[in-house]
């Protein structure tokens, strides 16, 4: 009930009424290995100074399911539910910031529209966390 009364809950209800709400969106996203593991990639580059110029960087595929996204007039809103038992919102931000960044990147590539907002809703804290 707390979620439905939250700002995100109200916005989702409005988006659903406008036909602009999507749930459980699967995706696959190709990300350069150097983006995910920059320290390792830099170390490999340093060790192979004689590396072949034509060698291509590895791509890592990330797949997942976005809990909820909806469209408002000025962009997309990404919402991820979390049930983790944490003490405060900053713990969830630290744990899941990268995950939501990749989710946003996937949505932007898929829909060719900007993600204007990334939100975590913590059921344990009964709180919206804007990233």
Spans of features found by a protein language model:
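Structural signature of nuclease core domains in nucleic-acid processing machines
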Residues: 1-131
């Amino acid at each position: 009930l707390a979620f439905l009364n939250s700002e995100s809950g109200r916005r989702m209800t409005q988006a659903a009424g406008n036909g602009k709400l999507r749930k459980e969106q699967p995706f696959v996203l190709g990300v350069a290995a150097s983006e995910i593991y920059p320290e390792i990639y830099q170390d490999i580059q340093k060790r192979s100074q004689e590396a072949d110029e034509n060698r291509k960087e590895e791509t890592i595929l990330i797949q997942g399911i976005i809990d909820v996204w909806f469209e408002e007039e000025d962009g997309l809103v990404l919402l991820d539910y979390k049930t983790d038992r944490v003490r405060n919102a900053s713990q969830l931000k630290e744990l899941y910031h990268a995950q939501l960044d990749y989710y946003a990147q996937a949505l932007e590539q898929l829909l060719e529209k900007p993600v204007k907002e990334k939100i975590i809703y913590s059921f344990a804290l009964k709180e919206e966390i804007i990233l």
